[in-house]
């Protein structure tokens, strides 16, 4: 009798790489493995010999010297603010906001600004291996449209503030526009709406309570700046007799749906309460240092069981959208703040920028790791550069030595959006020219 031949698995794409870092439960580094993609999802992750024997792929890609990793998740940014990069630097947060950023936004922000700024941000993020980001800005419907066209995954933040802008006159109008955004994108595979009340000092109690009710009804995340600076905490304490976290807790907003950004001013009981409620925290180390806002106690949060993700913040306060840089800075800063060399080791830093980010955005079942059944959001990094050689530990090199320019290929939901470092869904010359024109207009004003 002849042995029964096993029918080959059909796949759209089979990638052979020297290393795969799936960001699984054991933080594995898999040598000489292959990853198969079918219908936009990961169909198999196998040793190369098994993959060659068992998988029949429409296309095969050889990536010697490369590591495959999950797409990076930028858990907090303001993508259109890429057009304000370098407008005002070396200033504390409130001076930066009140005297420079908010006046510029009041004059310039419209749908064209948001579209051009978002495209510039997408170009930078895709080239740096970011496949999903959590955005907070005006005209989120435009950001959603641009991301859908480019094949980028986004949580489009439906912003809420008390004061009038060119976008809306009051909190009611912000919420109405947010609900329209949700209705438009509620079933979109890449664009997912979220509420984005700016902060506890820019949004009063009634709109915050409405955000909580609507977020519960619609099952969406709530994205907010929280405990960013000492002055913010003191301002809210004087105005309301309680610290911002306590205020949100009283309003019922703490919980897994809340994405709390910055969190540099935390006391022990607040960390315990964040852990108890399952509240998500986003650490933006480079922006916080540049604005002298303080240090997020990442090691204490992680030790307490709080999920911590990484964000770049906007390009106006960072001044780049480079999560490779944020991983390295987060790992180094955590060691200095905790006084411990093993605080946030390389594998944990990579997790902050991938799986933890996905969890913060409520997407951990779909993205954040390279596992069978998840969406094929994949990044290939060339580790052949001088500063990532020799290669003893791929994860350490990715976190402590690699640069965003080493990202060579990117797929989102199985669609190739970056090939050999060149974007396939964006037009760089047009985007850069639009940015130059905006820069000239703003500088001359």
Q: Residue spans of the language-model regions?
A:
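Active-site glycine- and acidic-residue-rich loops that bind
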Residues: 134-137, 194-210, 289-291, 360-362
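Alpha-helical scaffold segments that flank or form the walls of functional sites
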Residues: 85-151, 174-187, 436-444
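His/Asp/Glu-enriched, well-ordered alpha-helical/loop segment
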Residues: 250-257, 299-385, 401-402
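Histidine-centered divalent metal-coordination motifs
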Residues: 72-80, 223-225, 262, 313
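Active-site microenvironment of metallo-dependent hydrolases
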Residues: 1-33, 37-43, 48, 54, ...
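Metal-coordinating catalytic core of metallo-dependent amide/deamination hydrolases
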Residues: 142-264
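Active-site gating loops and adjacent loop-to-helix segments of metal-dependent hydrolytic enzymes
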Residues: 83-116, 153-172, 230-257, 277-280, ...
